[in-house]
Amino acid sequence: MIDDTLLEAEEKMEKATNVARENFAAIRTGRANPALFSKITVEYYGTPTPLNQLASFTVADARLIVIHPYDKGSLRAIEKAIRDSDLGVNPTDDGSVIRVAIPPLTEERRRDYIKMARHEAEEARVAIRNIRRHAKDALDKLQKDGEVGEDDVRRAEKELDELTHKYVAHIDEMLKHKEAELLEV
């Protein structure tokens, strides 16, 4: 029972870390990265559809992404969705592909993105701590119900604290890399 609680907590912490990783990837750094488009949805025949289901992406160079729509009829809708997004890029199409030049970031924009990254990291840390709290409550309930002894619960809580520290440190490391990437000119 204790092992199940710890395993469930670790799985949830891993998921929270993965969500943070995806959110960090979606923050623009001034370099061409297809993950920038992961949160964009396109009105495709009246249905909001994720862009990555409508096209493939090629990174032509450090500041250029070429988008190849699977259906040429979706070209205008994809271009409009990118233009309307908050990425601050200007897509151009040549009738068969869309080219997106990634402009260099201004110092002010870099600071905004760093704030955004720190906010994402804090949300992930809070999620991990909440998972820890729920797992600790479950362990306390097991002890209260008399299913496990106090020593076992203390050992499990120590393990839970180590897990929490490990995942929070991982989030901090990802944030450090993202900040370095954003500050790189």
Curated annotation (Swiss-Prot):
Q: Which UniProt keywords apply?
A: Cytoplasm, Protein biosynthesis
Function noted in UniProt: Responsible for the release of ribosomes from messenger RNA at the termination of protein biosynthesis. May increase the efficiency of translation by recycling ribosomes from one round of translation to another.
What species was this sequence derived from? Acidothermus cellulolyticus (strain ATCC 43068 / DSM 8971 / 11B)
Regarding protein family, the annotation reads: Belongs to the RRF family.
Signal sequence range: none
Membrane-crossing residues? none
- GO MF annotations, alphabetized: ribosomal large subunit binding
* Pfam families for this protein: RRF
Any one GO CC term of the record: cytoplasm
Name the gene behind this protein: frr
Domain of life according to the entry: Bacteria
**Which biological processes are named by the entry's GO terms?**
translational termination
Compartmental location: Cytoplasm
Put simply, this protein is called: Ribosome-recycling factor
